[in-house]
UniProtKB/Swiss-Prot annotation:
The lineage of its organism: Bacteria, Bacillati, Cyanobacteriota, Cyanophyceae, Oscillatoriophycideae. Pfam families: HisG (PF01634). GO terms for biological process: L-histidine biosynthetic process. PANTHER family: ATP PHOSPHORIBOSYLTRANSFERASE, ATP PHOSPHORIBOSYLTRANSFERASE ATP-PRTASE. The gene is hisG. InterPro entries: ATP_PRibTrfase_cat, ATP_PRibTrfase_CS, ATP_PRibTrfase_HisG, ATP_PRibTrfase_HisG_short. GO terms for cellular component: cytoplasm. Heteromultimer composed of HisG and HisZ subunits. This is ATP phosphoribosyltransferase. GO terms for molecular function: ATP binding; ATP phosphoribosyltransferase activity. It comes from Gloeothece citriformis (strain PCC 7424). Belongs to the ATP phosphoribosyltransferase family. Short subfamily.
C-alpha cells in the first residue's frame, strides 16, 4: 500500500480530484466533519496523510509517504531531497516583491541598501537578493506579511500572490516576480527508483492525465 501526503489548504481539493481520476478516493478529507489526518482509499489500495503544505516534502523525504503534492514555492524554500516528477498545472501563483503603492520604488534594484524585506519565504528572498547583489535584511514573518511595510517595519515584502487582491486591499503593489509556482508531484527518491509498492504504476497513471514532466 502506498502512502500519499496531501497538503491542507488551497491545493487540497484539486489534489483529491486528481487522485480520484486514477481511482484513489480521498474525498473524506473534504467533509467538514472530518477530523482524521490519515485515511485509506475505500479499495484499501492507498492511504493519504493530511499535513501542512510545508510538511509534505518532509514526510516524502523521510519515507513516511512515497508520493506527495506540494507547491513549487515550498520546494524552492525548503530544498528537500525528493524527486520532482511533474508539474500538475493547478494552484498557479507567483512569488513577488511588493511595496507600498505610495513608495518611490518600482523595481527591486531601487530598494535602499540594507533595506528591510519581510517574508515567510526567507530562503527564497535571501537567494533572490543575493543574486541581484543587493544587501538587504530579511525579516522572518509567518503571519500577515503585508503588515511589515504598513507598520513601517520593512520597505518591502516577498510573498506568494495569486489574484493580487490582498495586496491591493492593503495598499501594496508588485514590483518584481521571483518565479511562477504551481502544484508539483513529488516522490521519495529511493522508493521511486526501486519501484516499491508498484509506485511507477501510479505515477504513470497520473502522467497520462496530460501532465507536464519536470526536466
Amino acid at each position: 500500500m502506498i502512502t500519499i501526503a496531501l497538503p491542507k489548504g488551497a491545493l487540497l481539493s484539486d489534489s483529491i480530484a486528481l487522485f480520484k481520476q486514477i481511482g484513489l478516493d480521498f474525498t473524506a478529507f473534504l467533509d467538514s466533519s472530518n477530523r482524521q489526518l490519515q485515511i485509506s482509499d475505500p479499495t484499501n489500495t492507498a492511504k493519504a496523510l493530511l499535513v501542512r503544505a510545508q510538511d509534505v516534502p518532509v514526510y516524502v523525504e523521510y519515507g513516511q509517504a512515497q508520493l506527495g503534492i506540494v507547491g513549487y514555492d515550498v520546494l524552492l524554500e525548503k530544498t528537500p531531497k525528493v524527486a520532482n516528477l511533474a508539474d500538475l498545472k493547478f494552484g498557479a501563483c507567483r512569488m513577488s516583491v511588493a511595496v507600498p503603492a505610495k513608495s518611490p520604488y518600482r523595481s527591486s534594484i531601487e530598494l535602499p541598501p540594507n533595506g528591510r524585506v519581510a517574508s515567510k519565504f526567507v530562503h527564497c528572498a535571501e537567494d533572490y537578493f543575493r543574486r541581484l547583489d543587493i544587501p538587504v535584511e530579511i525579516i522572518p514573518l509567518y503571519g500577515s506579511v503585508e503588515l511589515g511595510p504598513i507598520t513601517g517595519m520593512s520597505d518591502a515584502i516577498v510573498d506568494l500572490v495569486s489574484t493580487g487582491r490582498t495586496l491591493r486591499e492593503n495598499g501594496l503593489v508588485e514590483i518584481d516576480v521571483l518565479f511562477e509556482s504551481t502544484a508539483r508531484l513529488i516522490a521519495h527518491p529511493l522508493s521511486y527508483r526501486l519501484n516499491l509498492d508498484h509506485l511507477d504504476q501510479w505515477v504513470n497513471k497520473l502522467r497520462q492525465i496530460n501532465l507536464k514532466p519536470v526536466a
